[in-house]
Amino acid sequence: MVSYMSKSQTDGLEFVLTLSCPDKPGIVYAVSSFLVQHSANIIDSQQYGEPDGGLFFMRVHFSVPQPRPVAELERDFTWVAEAFHMSWRLHGKSERIKTLLMVSQLGHCLNDLLFRWGAGSLPVDITGVVSNHDKFRGLTDSYQLPFHFIPVTPDTKPAAEAQLMSIIDDTSTELVVLARYMQILSSEVCKRVEGRMINIHHSFLPSFKGAKPYHQAHAKGVKLVGATAHYVTPDLDEGPIIEQGLMRVDHSYSPERLVEAGRDVEAQVLARAVTWHAEHRVLLNGNRTVVLGG
């Protein structure tokens, strides 16, 4: 099955091609030949073939000598994709993914992402911040971004999720980041945004799921605390893992100190996951991911 999608019809000099397909000889040669035919220069390239001969994954960042429309390059690449039954996408390197941030009452991840974005080191276009609390309106306003306060109760959850999806659609949001948003989303919402919603879980999955993982870790006497960034699926905290991080601790750490240590890890792990997604480095492989050049 061949699939592709362009994000823009604008001309560009640099592009990122990502693809996956059944592994067989000749894939790299075919892609390289296509690039040579278009006088393209490979700036960066990574690839991975599953050891059992299953799927092949590739990401190529290349430039062309004259501005070219994405649609034109897509059309020319179609014959290569069809020959190898590729699922693929071509992105203009300068295009930034429209990203919506969501938060509840803990702002360390939100603050970190906004700071990186303001400093120019987070390669996304933030469309706004959604929260079920009004706590971070001032922080959001300081970055001159829209703040959407959507309270959630069991009775209002369907209406709140409808409002959320309306914001996503109206802003053409391509990525949603749950920066410690603590409401459990319905299966319907998870399915609609599958593959484009990232959550940070305050634990090194698959251990210590659910509420108060640091207290669970303290009770177990762990020597490491961590965080996991993963794509959201209808199965809670079971989505494909993008990135994980760890910090060494010892017996002297109280639950409160473990929380403080873990928050630093959470912010770093989430920022890396968002960056890799925005740079088109993360390719899905069933319930796993392949991160090329992360």
Task: Describe each PLM feature range.
Residues 99-109:
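Short, glycine-rich nucleotide/cofactor-binding loops
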Residues 133, 156-160, 171-294:
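Donor/substrate-binding cores of folate-linked one-carbon enzymes
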Residues 124-135:
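Short internal beta-strands
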Residues 20, 100-102, 130:
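Short hydrophobic segments within beta-strands
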Residues 141, 145-171:
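Adenosine-nucleotide cofactor-binding segment
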Residues 108-119:
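Histidine-anchored nucleotide/phosphate-binding helix
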Residues 41, 125, 146-148, 196:
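Conserved beta-strand segments of alpha/beta enzyme cores
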Residues 2-97:
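A conserved regulatory-domain signal marking ACT and ACT-like small-molecule sensing domains
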